[in-house]
Amino acid sequence: MILQKMPHYVDSILTQEDASAALQDGQVVVGLYTNRENVQSVVHSHPYYEMILPVAGSSVRYSVDGSVYDLHLGELILFPGEMYHSGKFNITDTTSERLVVQIAPGIWERAWAQSGLPRHVWSGDPVILDTDAVTQWDFRGLLERMAQTVYLDEKIRDTVQCCEVTELILLISQV
């Protein structure tokens, strides 16, 4: 299983200061997050885009600008950069496991330009994909492949990551 080859964070405590920092480990950062004891995040925003896919355990509840989104196993949410949000991780079970992808704004912009899509296609609100769309287009497989790009030669890593983010943008625009 590919999930074993990516960073795994258990009960990590996110601070507003940490969240607001730029990505430190590259332009596309993927990790598996497990929460057992730490059941809630602080309200935070970050300069990068963030995608979250619950893969085991509890549903997750996100609060965004006064709206509440319940994200069930197999559903995916995409937060644009600078969007304040918080998560509660123990809604339906005591443990939550989520695949989290963080995408730097620079590579997102290059991928968007490469996609050829007009800007009005996406309003900048959170995007939620239901389980059927996530399964049909194998978003989990795409996110797991994105995790593997850290092992690529630096000469091709940026190009592959940009192509994967472009694929992500194009697929989201179709669902």
Language-model segments: which ranges?
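N-terminal regulatory/effector-sensing and dimerization cores
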Residues: 24-122, 153-154, 158
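Generic detector of well-ordered alpha-helical segments enriched in charged/polar residues
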Residues: 7, 11, 109, 140-147
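A short, N-terminal "cap"/entry segment at the start of jelly-roll beta-barrel domains
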Residues: 1-26
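Intrinsic disorder/low-complexity segments
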Residues: 20-22, 32, 148
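A ubiquitous short alpha-helical element
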Residues: 14, 123-134
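Surface-exposed loop/turn and secondary-structure junction residues enriched for glycine/proline
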Residues: 17, 99, 111, 131-132
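An amphipathic alpha-helical interaction segment
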Residues: 130-175
